[in-house]
């Protein structure tokens, strides 16, 4: 994901392209004769506009979210305090710390205790199809993020900056499942020694 300075530069560059693409789309809608031309104008305008608005959004959000990183550090410390004597260190790493998750968190934090439509979150990712999955991954870490659907519209709300440490065993279990460093039997033994159910 681009940094804040490059996002501002990209926004000014892409804004003109988006204006042109939307103009072509409006023209195709007004003078609709060939369905294929209309569809092509729409898909192009959608792609260019998504990239332009992503740049504008990332220029608006902080380039580095210290609270996001502090919460990750809290989760990491809690994992280590519980399991460092029984679980290998490479399974005690906090996932989902990349720029995409950080950007989504920044937008949700900006609207703390307020509903945010999934469509707004998709601006952060350039309308990526996996945006809502990335948001739900924040919930897997124990972030106080709630989801509901209203009139078939997905709504997300970060209700506080508290963490639910009860989800830490599931983080370790998921890390073990994804790891290629251990056999299936080794993973079972690691989880058993840590007192973490294999299924959950």
What are these regions (language model features)?
Residues 112-124:
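Short acidic, hydrophobic short linear motifs in intrinsically disordered regions
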Residues 162-188:
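Short, amphipathic alpha-helical interaction segments positioned at domain boundaries
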Residues 143:
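Short phosphate-binding/catalytic loops that engage adenosine nucleotides
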Residues 1-76, 84, 191-200:
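Long, compositionally biased intrinsically disordered regions
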Residues 150-160:
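Minor-groove-contacting beta-hairpin "wing" of winged helix-turn-helix DNA-binding domains
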Residues 73-106:
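Short alpha-helical segments that sit at the start of domains
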Residues 126-140, 148-150:
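Short amphipathic alpha-helical interaction segments
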């Amino acid at each position: 994901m681009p940094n804040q300075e490059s996002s501002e530069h990209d926004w000014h560059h892409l804004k003109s392209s988006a204006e042109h693409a939307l103009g072509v789309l409006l023209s195709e809608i007004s003078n609709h004769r060939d369905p294929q031309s209309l569809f092509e104008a729409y898909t192009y305008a959608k792609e260019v506009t998504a990239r332009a608005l992503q740049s504008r959004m990332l220029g608006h959000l902080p380039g580095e979210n210290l609270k996001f990183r502090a919460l990750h550090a809290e989760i990491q410390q809690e994992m280590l305090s519980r399991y460092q004597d029984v679980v290998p260190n490479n399974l005690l790493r906090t996932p989902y710390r990349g720029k995409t998750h950080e950007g989504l968190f920044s937008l949700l934090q900006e609207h703390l205790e307020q509903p945010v439509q999934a469509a707004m979150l998709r601006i952060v990712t350039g309308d990526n199809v996996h945006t809502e999955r990335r948001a739900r991954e924040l919930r897997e870490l124990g972030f106080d993020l709630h989801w509901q659907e209203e009139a078939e519209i997905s709504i997300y709300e970060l209700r506080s900056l508290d963490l639910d440490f009860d989800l830490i065993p599931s983080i370790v279990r998921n890390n073990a499942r994804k790891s290629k460093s251990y056999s299936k039997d080794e993973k079972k033994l690691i989880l058993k020694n840590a007192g973490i159910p294999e299924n959950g």
